[in-house]
Amino acid sequence: ATLQAITAGGFTMTVNGTLVVISAVNLSAVTSFAQAASAIQTKLQTQKPGTLCSYDASLGKFVITSPTSGVTSTITVASADVSGLAAAIGMLSATLVQGKSEETPEDALTQCEQYDNSFYGVALDSEYDDVQASYDAAVWTQARNKVFFNTTNDADCLTATAPTTLVGQMKDASLKRTSATYGPVAGSYAGVSVAGRAFTVNFEGTNTTLTLMYKKLPAITVAKLSSSQKGHLASINCNVFLDAGGNSIYDEGKMADGTFFDTVHGTDWLQNRIETDVFNLMYRSPTKVPYTDTGVSMIIQKVERGLRQGVTNGLIAPGQTTDGTYLELGYRIDYIPVSDVSDADKGNRIYRGVTFIAVGAGAIHKITITGSFSE
């Protein structure tokens, strides 16, 4: 009834620094708050196009929104109330929310991290493909135990200028936690498709680890490239879903520094598995893990449990270490007896004596076969 009594209402305010004078607002025929908001918006549009007026039923408030965003988006409380219109819609004592600078992906990731740091994979909206924000996200990810899946549509990656591209810069920075994928179609989210395939691995299974090489990427356009173009992509460790002899395959599954993705993914899993098992050993103990050789043996059992699962899932296999030592189990665990631990560490209840070395099973990507034939 208060609104319907207004036949020639008005008020003044500023929107983005521009004075807006609203007048001759007739609400005598409205039957809802939404209709009243629509009538006010019609007047606002004539003064400041794009300015909106709506009614939020959940809050029970009228909301006026400027037509822009960012730090230049400002609005002021209404004044010069005519016929009580501003008072009726709560604009004389309204809560003001001014525009802010655009949040960068790096800022958003930091906020996510502070709220819940359990996420592992990172990918950005396609609007950030091939812009500085994607490089910043890659650097952000590198500083944490996470993986960034980057998508590029930059055709320069297919030419001799590839090293100057953002992907080339990622290679130069040796970003071991960034996987870059070239997609011929803008907005394809090729990197997201890679993440979806990569994260299907069940490390608690048997022979479940995989290489990304030769895999399919559903809904991703296949790139038809010349050998020269493929070479330029390879020179900057940029992956691609391409046509190879009539077959669609992902090539080659490397990170920006040249490390294969499955190595990074697998060792991250192994670290998390061992850390979790050792933590649970202490957390679930009704008493304690004693600082004795018996306590150290309990820790070693948990470390070996993770390594054995690494053998089971195919991450680890018997083989030679870099110094030529053959490990029949695929791993070796060493430890320091409690008697050799420093008094300072024992006094602080810190044990640093367990180390291990493991041999990765790896994967075969290319095969060279030689032979001869005589008749």
List PLM regions with ranges.
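Amphipathic, non-membrane alpha-helical segments that mediate helix-helix packing
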Residues: F33-L44, I64, V122, V296-L307, ...
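Structured alpha-helical segments in the cores of large, soluble enzyme domains
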Residues: T7, P105-L109, L270-T276
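Structured, hydrophobic secondary-structure cores that serve as assembly/anchoring elements
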Residues: N247-E375
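Extended, beta-strand-rich, solvent-exposed assembly scaffolds of outer structural proteins
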Residues: A1-L85, Y135-D136
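Extended basic-aromatic, gly/pro-enriched interface segments that bind polyanionic ligands
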Residues: Q114, G168-I299
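Second-shell loop/turn segments in exported
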Residues: S23-V30, E127, S285-T292
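Extracellular Cys-Trp
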Residues: Y55, T76-Y214
